[in-house]
Amino acid sequence: MNTAKELYDRWLAQPELDTAVAEELHGIAGDDAAITDRFYRDLEFGTGGLRGVLGAGTNRMNLYTVRKATQGLADYLNATDLPKKIAIAHDSRNNGELFTREAARVLAANDITACVYPRLEPTPALSWAVRYLGCGAGVCITASHNPAKYNGYKVYGADGCQITLEVADKILAAIEKVDCFDGVKLVDYEAGVQAGRIVSIDDKCLDDFVQAVYDQRVGDGTGIEQLKLVYTPLNGTGLECVKKLLAKLGVTHVTVVPEQETPDGNFPTCPYPNPEIREAMQKGLELCDKAHPDLLLGTDPDCDRCGTAVPDGKGGYRLITGNEMGIILLDYICRTRLTRGTMPKDPVAVTTIVSTDMATPVAKKYGVELRRTLTGFKFIGEQIGKLEAEGHVERYIFGFEESYGYLSGGHVRDKDAVNATLLVCEAAAWYAQQGMTLLDAIEALYKEFGYYRNALCSFAFEGETGMYTMQNLMKTLRADPPKEIAGYAVERVADYDTDGTGLPRANVLEYHLAGGHKLMVRPSGTEPKIKVYLSAVGKSEAEADAVNAELAKAAEMLMK
């Protein structure tokens, strides 16, 4: 195995090395720490594909690591009976177009047709295109809501769902056989176009995607045209599809946050373009103070997550959490479909193990089977696929995760913020007809089912030493599990890496505490972070908030 310094020297010795890559490598000459950080490993490839910091080296996102991954994907696909066609999309992130072109060049050289969106488009539109065009796989160049220094390479299967662990392992095995310089086949981009191996996805595909979302309407739309919205795409891809959908719905009172309207991979107004974070929604909230809308909607750069704020009744606006919106929409969909007689027999809703436990009593009230999966919407998409294989895809009525991902139909197999926009607008309009806001709605649900409070604490571990620290922390928690957390006895520990949970093995620890509270520890699959999910329940808002605050302090202690 080559050392980091040997790899560094080999990269610099390459003829015709990309100028930007060469400049960065020359700039760190003699800096052992910088060289090691860029070359001590290859970027990890898993079910989420690749994700990493932009830059030079094997541990960075650059045209060479993208080429290598694509060659491995091509080798995998060519060894299967799947269609030799791959759809590619990219969002607004820096180098998105470059990586798209490089991936297409590699695919074309391997006799695989690359179907490329001609401009940046949402991730769910890529999931749609894979199935719509009959592709064997899909690639989306995105790092979702990560900071601007990141980009990624997300791989989808022929079903439009993110790849399974089994497929990821096969693709990884193929990638590991590829030398990023000598082992990659390439054609000139224009030559690939002329040969018919690189083709542009036409507008009909995208228009039909928006129509498919529109067809997911649950209610009759009464009052929806009266809604007044402020919308921000957070300098990402959402504007085109969201505005097309709103026009179909008859929602014309839409004000777009001007500073965040244009795609910009530097995300100048919000370092973390994540609608879960107040800072990302701040410009929208400021505009709300002037425009006084019924709703503020924000979609992340690849338009698969949707954040919402509503009037708080005190002259301001209150952000709705991902769990709260998931519960509002689950209740709205169940209530409306039962009322309209459109609820299927044996309905199924799906959520994840880290999403709110409040979904359980809500689903039970309406006679809906609630399935829980591992973290990641790909597992929700997998459940849709299983129902489809059984000939009962219509049983699926809704899926959500706490990180602002929602999907109410089988038109795509990933979270879809365009679909979420439809659902949120529908629910807001329905409650408005009852003289209520979405804030009133969640308050009524809390009074009915109990006050559930969920929070996420993220602990960052950067660089080479960070990975080892994360591994050692998880090892320690397994070897010496806590007997109590925040003063609450640990009644049961579930280790998803060893226990017979009925789910695939995963590096997740779950602590069930006295009083019905819960704490879960999970290293991120895409970032150098350990995520701790807190869940508290109380008879009042104050009680649940107090327990949550205690759990947050305890989480910090666990991570030290």
Predicted regions and their residues:
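An N-terminal, well-structured beta->alpha segment
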Residues: 3-103, 191-193, 198-226, 237
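Short glycine-rich or small-residue beta-strand-to-loop segments that form or flank ligand, phosphate
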Residues: 85-91, 228-231, 240, 407, ...
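N-terminal small/polar loop signature for handling phosphorylated ligands or for N-terminal nucleophile
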Residues: 87-150, 248-308
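Glycine-rich phosphate-binding loop plus the immediately following alpha-helix
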Residues: 156-186, 323-346, 351-362, 417
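Conserved phosphate/anionic-ligand binding catalytic regions in large, soluble enzymes, centered on
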Residues: 39-59, 143-144, 233-241, 245, ...
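Phosphate-binding and adjacent anionic-ligand microenvironments
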Residues: 289, 293-295, 316-318, 336-522, ...
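Gly/Ser/Thr-enriched, mixed-charge loops and adjacent short helices
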Residues: 12, 16, 34-39, 43, ...
